[in-house]
């Protein structure tokens, strides 16, 4: 995970993906409390937990900077045209397996940014010796846009499970030993 952390920030065709900073936290929390975000996640953010979320994010940022704790989670923001337009999370779940989550705020949806984010992190994982074997996405069955994006980025459906609120599909991208 530390090798992935060191590879960020990175640029896609039109966006910059960089680590979440302290000055982004208020925007980040406000954004994840909006209806568009909660529509397609299997848990529901709740404003009463904002202080807990803020403290967790601050602790995460300090851990990245100090590099004193094993990293299991990376949160980034996506800048498009100099404005914050979304986010990408990377969670280490096993030996070389990483769960991804990405989102784009409504004002920037429909511009191909989600596909850029997913292709960008996939290219990064393939192109460097980062110890990544598989990237995985969990997508609610009704999130047709994200399903299309996953398929366009080369992810394959490998299974499904019943989540808290809906059926979730699991898509995976496997990186071979040559980084493809």
Describe the predicted segments one by one.
Residues 29, 49-53, 70:
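Generic, well-ordered alpha-helical segments
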């Amino acid at each position: 995970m530390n090798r992935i952390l060191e590879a960020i920030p990175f640029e896609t065709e039109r966006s910059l993906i960089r680590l979440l900073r302290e000055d982004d936290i208020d925007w980040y929390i406000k954004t994840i409390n909006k209806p568009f975000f909660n529509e397609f996640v299997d848990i529901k953010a709740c404003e009463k937990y904002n202080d807990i979320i803020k403290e967790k994010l601050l602790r995460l940022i300090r851990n990245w900077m100090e590099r004193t704790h094993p990293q299991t989670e990376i949160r980034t923001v996506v800048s498009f045209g100099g404005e914050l337009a979304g986010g990408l999370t990377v969670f280490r779940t096993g030996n070389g397996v990483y769960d991804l989550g990405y989102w784009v705020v409504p004002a920037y949806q429909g511009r191909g940014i989600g596909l850029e984010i997913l292709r960008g992190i996939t290219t990064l994982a393939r192109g460097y010796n980062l110890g990544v074997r598989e990237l995985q996405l969990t997508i609610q069955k009704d999130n047709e846009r994200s399903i299309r994006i996953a398929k366009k980025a080369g992810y394959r459906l490998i299974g499904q499970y019943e989540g808290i609120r809906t059926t979730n599909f699991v898509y995976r991208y496997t990186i071979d030993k040559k980084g493809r």
